[in-house]
UniProtKB/Swiss-Prot annotation:
GO terms for biological process: cytochrome complex assembly. Keywords: Chloroplast, Cytochrome c-type biogenesis, Membrane, Plastid, Thylakoid, Transmembrane, Transmembrane helix. It comes from Manihot esculenta (Cassava). Required during biogenesis of c-type cytochromes (cytochrome c6 and cytochrome f) at the step of heme attachment. The gene is ccsA. Belongs to the CcmF/CycK/Ccl1/NrfE/CcsA family. Pfam families: Cytochrom_C_asm. One of its GO terms (molecular function) is heme binding. This is Cytochrome c biogenesis protein CcsA.
Length: 322
């Protein structure tokens, strides 16, 4: 009873705090001068992190195993992973470009986890025999951390595409009364090969320069985070294969979850291969990462919605009451 009450309190505190953080972010977008509000939002995410950590630890103590056995618990762990990614730039004293991605991601995953759809999963249950293995912590935690990092990195790529797909960007200063012109991403790629081109061309507006800088930062941050996520995903798949061999006598069974995990891994492997070519990095790799974003959600939710295959533990069915 005490554990259930504590879990209930921590769940709602974490969701309430991250909701306030989102509101603060929206205010700071409208008015940049509210520096104190920005600091408050960062502290709010730290509070959210500790609340979710407390929730996971409470459930871990009560159940006797790491809470990663169903969709509800994995969503909580996913929210926790997003909050960790959010805090990395903060503690390194860097400007937190991740906050626009990680805070909403934490909000939506935490909101879905606490929604009425997963009410039946909130109750603590004994772990099914197939999941009673030391590989549970290794495999599932690596997969969820990989999903979190890949989702964040892919969202940076989506933002990259949104900015670069703007039809017209004026590159001449209006004060010079010169002919207005525009450039598309092929020109951005050309400039990307020469990092200081925008600095050396005096008639380019500062607005276009900072847009270019933002594009470069989105591409760089996306690449870094996807690299980390890809490592976690690879470790998760390999540890899952070892676990499968111990449990079912085969490293790979082409289970729906395994198949989509392999497809997701392949897409991001293609992403890294594309980035080895300087002429293709940026725009083309961002398209591949955006496809990977969709595949991750298919891999993560697909089996849980269908409730089939060897990975259908903790799946849920949507019930409609009339």
């Amino acid at each position: 009873m005490i554990f259930s009450t504590l879990e209930h309190i921590l769940t709602h505190i974490s969701f309430s705090v991250v909701s306030i953080v989102i509101t603060i972010h929206l205010i700071t977008l409208l008015a940049d001068e509210f520096v104190e509000l920005y600091d408050s939002s960062e502290k709010g995410m730290i509070t959210t992190f500790f609340c979710i950590t407390g929730l996971l630890v409470t459930r871990w103590i009560f159940l006797g195993h790491l809470p990663l056995s169903d969709l509800y618990e994995s969503l909580i762990f996913l929210s926790w992973s997003f909050s960790i990614i959010h805090m990395v730039p903060y503690f390194k004293k860097h400007k937190n470009f991740l906050s626009a991605i990680t805070a909403p991601s934490t909000f939506f995953t935490q909101g879905f986890a606490t929604s009425g759809l997963l009410t039946d999963m909130h109750q603590s249950e004994i772990l099914v025999p197939a999941l009673q293995s030391q590989w549970l912590m290794m495999h599932v935690s690596m997969m969820i951390l990989g999903y979190a990092a890949l989702l964040c990195g892919s969202l940076f790529s989506v933002a990259f595409l949104v900015i670069t797909f703007r039809k017209i960007i004026r590159i001449f200063d209006k004060s010079n009364n010169l002919l207005n012109n525009s450039f598309f991403f092929s020109e951005i790629q050309y400039m990307a090969e020469r990092k200081n081109v925008l600095r050396n061309i005096s008639f380019l507006s500062s607005r276009n320069y900072y847009r270019f800088q933002l594009i470069q930062q989105l591409d760089d941050w996306g690449y870094r985070i996807i690299s980390i996520g890809f490592i976690f995903l690879t470790i998760g798949i390999l540890s899952g294969a070892v676990w499968a061999n111990e449990a079912w006598g085969s490293y790979w069974n082409w289970d729906p979850k395994e198949t989509w995990a392999f497809i997701t891994w392949t897409i991001f492997a293609i992403y890294f291969h594309i980035r080895t070519n300087k002429k293709l990095e940026g725009f083309h790799s961002a398209i591949v990462a955006s496809i990977g974003f969709l595949l991750i959600w298919i891999c993560y939710f697909g089996v849980n919605l269908l409730g089939i295959g060897l990975h259908s533990y903790g799946s849920f069915t949507l019930t409609i009451s009339i």
